[in-house]
Amino acid sequence: PTYWQLGVNWASKDYDPYQVPEYKAWATEDYYKSGYAEMLDVYMTGLYYSFITKDDVDKATGVVGQRSEAGMDNSLTYCYSVEGGAEIAKHITRGVVPVIGSIYVEQYLGDFTPFGPAVTQALKSTDGVMIFDIVHLNKHKLWEELEAAMKAAE
């Protein structure tokens, strides 16, 4: 919900943010016309978040985790979790394009414990997963974790 600041509107033209009260501050009445989901074959959404589930956000005590992507802020909102980010992407693309959840391996540098659950959540919440990037799987020897996470999503 903050990428509009960067001029990005990968939503479907059927999604009108002007109808969402908290978005009226930035969305114009015609903003929905700039949505381009219908022109995509696939949309890969970056789910580069420390929180995996919306429940994790609810349990947070003010520590937001790594937030280095453009357009991010420090709020404790569901959009900053793998589950919540995927939910928003699916909602605003309106089913006109497959949504693939992208997981950045080094988001979990220092503690790879959440990597597997992030992959599992991305697979459960979207139409597939893209791991960014294979070099990190090799470097950190995470192939077994990836396999287990993919099986857990079945």
Where on the chain are the PLM-derived regions?
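Glycoside hydrolase catalytic-domain groove-lining segments
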Residues: 1-110
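Aromatic-rich peripheral "rim/lid" segments of glycoside hydrolase catalytic domains that contact
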Residues: 110-128, 132-154
